[in-house]
Amino acid sequence: MTAIRGIYEVAIPVENLERAEAFYLGVLGLESGLRETERRWHFLRAGGSAGMLVLQENTGSFPSQHFAFTTSDAEIERAGVELRERGVEVTGPVTHDWMPARSIYFSDPDGHDLELCAPLDEVPPGA
C-alpha cells in the first residue's frame, strides 16, 4: 500500500503502568502525552515526532513485543553508555550490513525487546 509512510502508533501491554512510565519517561526520555487514568493507558511521544507509543496496563498474561526507535549513528555509542549507567543491560552496537544500520538492543521492565536503530548511508569499512 503506497499510502503508508511510517508507523504512527504502537501499543504495548505492561504489567504496571507506573513502572513502565518510570522507564519510558525517566530512563529513555520519551515525552508524556495523554494519560487515561481510568483505562490505565498512557500515550507517549519520542523526539517531537507525531508517532506515539501507548502503554496499556494489562494484568493478564501477554507475550513480549519488539519495536525500534530511530536514532543517529553518532548517538548509538552514547545511548548505550547512558542506558548502562542507568542500570539497563545493553547488547551491541551491532552492524546490519543488509539494512544498512547499526543497532543496540535492550529490554524494558516488562521484557519487551527494544532497539535503537541508526540507519546508515553505507556499510562502514571493517564492519
What positions do the PLM features span?
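N-terminal beta-strand motif that seeds the catalytic metal site of vicinal oxygen chelate
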Residues: M1-E18, H66-F67, L120-A127
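Core segments of cupin and vicinal oxygen chelate
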Residues: R5, A11-G51
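Vicinal oxygen chelate
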Residues: A3, I7-E15, R45-G47, N58-A127
